[in-house]
Amino acid sequence: MQELRFVLIVVGALAIMALLFHGLWTSKKEGKAKFGDKPLSKLDLGESEPKESEMYVAPEDDYEIIRKERKEPAFEDEKPFSTSGVIGDPLIDDLHSGQDKENKFSQPKFDDDITVAEAEAAASIEQDAPAWVEQPQEIDEPLTHHPDEIDAFSGEETIVELDEPMSQTVEPELQVIVLNVHCAGDSPFVGTKLFDSMQQNGLVYGEMDIFHRHLDMSGTGKVLFSVANMMHPGTLKHDDPAEFSTKGISFFMTLPCYGEADQNFNLMLKTAQKIADDLGGNVLDDKRNLMTPDRLAGYRRQIVEFKAANA
């Protein structure tokens, strides 16, 4: 027992000496490093850094405080000391401490840049946020209601309903068939005889100051064909029939027309021939050439083709 007690006393004394030696050595090493950092900090940091350098310089009275703080770490804290294996050198320590200080002061500047950029980005996001937030609210509100869906379908139905009448109301291209009755010689037609013959053949003076052939001989009903002045201005307007004269009149009908187009054409041709016979004139085609059987066949063929194209 006495031997064991002696061994424990020796081991405890050695441990205490080792801790004291370790504390003295580390305090001297830090004192040299802080002393070497002082000139470099004045060159690099200017007037604002002496405060920090003064903080690093500790008086001799503080060594006891440092020694007391160094007694607290356990044996695991000795790993950095054992792994370094390098005795402190003031020149090397000055370089490392200078680099550390540069890194310490460079990082806050970089962080400041980041914070400025983040602040600007946050400000831009705050400015843009209301525009992007309000629009979805306006769009989402109608989408949540079912009547909008009904309106969409009803809109499509109205489009279909509009397309059908348009397809039904598309009219074929208007065509005009023209016949002319021209005086045989140099003597023009006199209004008295001309108007009397026209009235006897069922023509009635009416709209646009020209004569019309209606479905009813009394001048009522749909217009089948019309008769105008062959000469300028084209009207048959007159105050005194005896003072009116013209070298010819023009019969015309349109395609499509009311009733049967071929029957209307035959009636128009028959009326033109009667008036030409009454006045001693000639029946001409649309180009003011004498009417021929071939040209009459061309008129009838035009009517048949028009009916077939619009059947």
From Swiss-Prot:
Give the record's GO CC terms: cell division site; plasma membrane
Its localization reads: Cell inner membrane
Q: Which Pfam families match?
A: ZipA_C
- At the top level, the lineage of the source is Bacteria
User: Which Gene3D superfamilies does the record cross-reference, listed alphabetically?
Assistant: ZipA, C-terminal FtsZ-binding domain
Q: What keywords would UniProt list here?
A: Cell cycle, Cell division, Cell inner membrane, Cell membrane, Membrane, Transmembrane, Transmembrane helix
Q: Give GO terms for biological process.
A: division septum assembly; FtsZ-dependent cytokinesis
Give the compositionally biased regions (Basic and acidic residues).
Answer: 32-54
Membrane spanning residue stretches? 6-26
Q: Extract the ranges annotated as region (Disordered).
A: 32-60
Topology with respect to the bilayer: Single-pass type I membrane protein
What is this protein for, i.e. what is its function? Essential cell division protein that stabilizes the FtsZ protofilaments by cross-linking them and that serves as a cytoplasmic membrane anchor for the Z ring. Also required for the recruitment to the septal ring of downstream cell division proteins.
Oligomeric state and interaction partners are given as: Interacts with FtsZ via their C-terminal domains.
Q: Kindly give the PANTHER family that the UniProt entry links to this protein.
A: CELL DIVISION PROTEIN ZIPA (PTHR38685:SF1)
- Which family does the entry's similarity section mention? Belongs to the ZipA family.
The protein here is known as: Cell division protein ZipA
Q: What is the lineage of its organism?
A: Bacteria, Pseudomonadati, Pseudomonadota, Gammaproteobacteria, Vibrionales
